[in-house]
Design a protein with these regions (language model features):
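Structural beta-alpha unit
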Residues: 1-5, 71-99, 105-106, 127, ...
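Long, charge-dense
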Residues: 51-76, 86
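Small/aliphatic-rich secondary-structure junction motif
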Residues: 3-56, 69
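Short beta-alpha junction loops
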Residues: 45-50, 81, 124-125
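General small-molecule cofactor/ligand-binding pocket signal
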Residues: 41-43, 74-79, 119-121
Length: 139
């Protein structure tokens, strides 16, 4: 199953992480936004655990933020104890139409988000997948 490029949406949200594979989330989200003439934003949720983050993870996060900004995303840093709860609340407040997120977070989000379209895309040379959430059906 591939991404739905025919869906019309006004805004796309990228979920940033410290993963070296997060660039794939950014690329796909930017492509979806471009195809739909949608605004692009990105969010990273900082938790208390992030204080003990390794230097390599911090570096990867900085690179992912810079990459998202280079694709035209407005980056927002949120603070909280639960990444998924913060993302879901941000989506509700911001009226985001589409969220592009890594599988590790998406599997947790599915328990909180109902009646959404989920599309997956394989990472190149990797078993992981991306998930695409279309929130336009909520309005």
């Amino acid at each position: 199953m591939g991404l739905c490029y025919t869906c019309r949406m006004a805004s796309v949200l990228l979920c940033l992480s410290t993963s070296k594979y997060n660039s794939r989330v950014i690329e796909k989200g930017a492509q979806i936004a471009k195809n739909n003439h949608a605004t692009l934003s990105a969010v990273y949720v900082q938790t208390p655990k992030d204080e003990s983050m390794s230097a390599a993870s911090k570096s990867c996060l900085r690179e992912n933020i810079k990459f998202a900004e280079s694709k035209g995303a407005k980056v927002t840093i949120l603070y909280g104890h639960n990444k998924i709860r913060q993302i879901v609340e941000y989506v509700d407040v911001s009226q985001v139409d589409c969220v592009v997120i890594e599988k590790s977070l998406a599997s947790q989000a599915l328990f909180r988000l109902r009646d959404i379209d989920v599309y997956s895309v394989n990472y190149p040379h990797d078993y992981r997948r991306l998930f695409y959430f279309d929130f336009s059906s909520f309005r």
